[in-house]
Amino acid sequence: MPISSLVPLTEIRQYCLQLGFSLSDQEIESLRGYLCLLTKWNKVMNLVGFTTWKTICSNLIIDSFHLAIFIRSLSLPTDPLCWDFGSGAGLPGIPLRIIWKEGSYWLVESREKRAIFLKTLLAQYPLTQTYVYCGRVEEFMLANCLSDVALIVSRAFMPWQALLKLIEKKISFKGVIVLLLNDIPKNIDSCWYIQTTYPYSIGGEKRFFVALKKAS
């Protein structure tokens, strides 16, 4: 049985509506492509801890949909350059790019097999100005100019304190860092401040997106 038949378009649309999100026909097609490839590769690579497309949607992809709402509320420049650190299985970046197509978006992943998955996915289901870099974040930052970066996204790349320390040294960075956390961070270094937060709940569990900027 083709794997696409295990992820029906109409069911995806209805399920997304149940979760509170309405997607266009093209977005549903792209989401199905992602779910098909993710569930297929997950059987041999253990990309995510959930095994069915519905549990992947309700526990992981929904974060990306909320992230899109949050990012739209930020005052990003036109055509923003965005970096996604520790992209892994493409979460939150791939579903985010399906529904939020502004600017260019780099998925940075050091683990080769996961980077191959992301490149395979984008070769089969291209997304607007979305690219993959296979290598360490430190190497990626050395090869690119942080002064041009409007947004850095991190879901589970490293502890947020370590990430802020890493970026803190790059004095040219003037953009926003968005973190997915289970609580609003406390005792933030004086080099940073919380610009805004976005709380939401999934299955009774509270989660937060937190936007941070460097203090002047």
From Swiss-Prot:
Catalytic activity reported: guanosine(527) in 16S rRNA + S-adenosyl-L-methionine = N(7)-methylguanosine(527) in 16S rRNA + S-adenosyl-L-homocysteine
The organism's place on the tree of life at top rank: Bacteria
Subcellular location: Cytoplasm
Entry EC no(s): 2.1.1.170
Main location: cytoplasm
Coiled-coil segments: none
Pfam families: GidB
Family annotation (SUPFAM superfamilies): S-adenosyl-L-methionine-dependent methyltransferases
GO function terms (MF aspect): rRNA (guanine-N7-)-methyltransferase activity
Cellular compartments per GO CC: cytosol
Record InterPro entries: rRNA_ssu_MeTfrase_G, SAM-dependent_MTases_sf
Xref: PANTHER family: S-ADENOSYL-L-METHIONINE-DEPENDENT METHYLTRANSFERASES SUPERFAMILY PROTEIN (PTHR31760:SF0)
Family, similarity comment: Belongs to the methyltransferase superfamily. RNA methyltransferase RsmG family.
This protein's name: Ribosomal RNA small subunit methyltransferase G
Organism listed in the record: Lawsonia intracellularis (strain PHE/MN1-00)
Gene behind the chain: rsmG
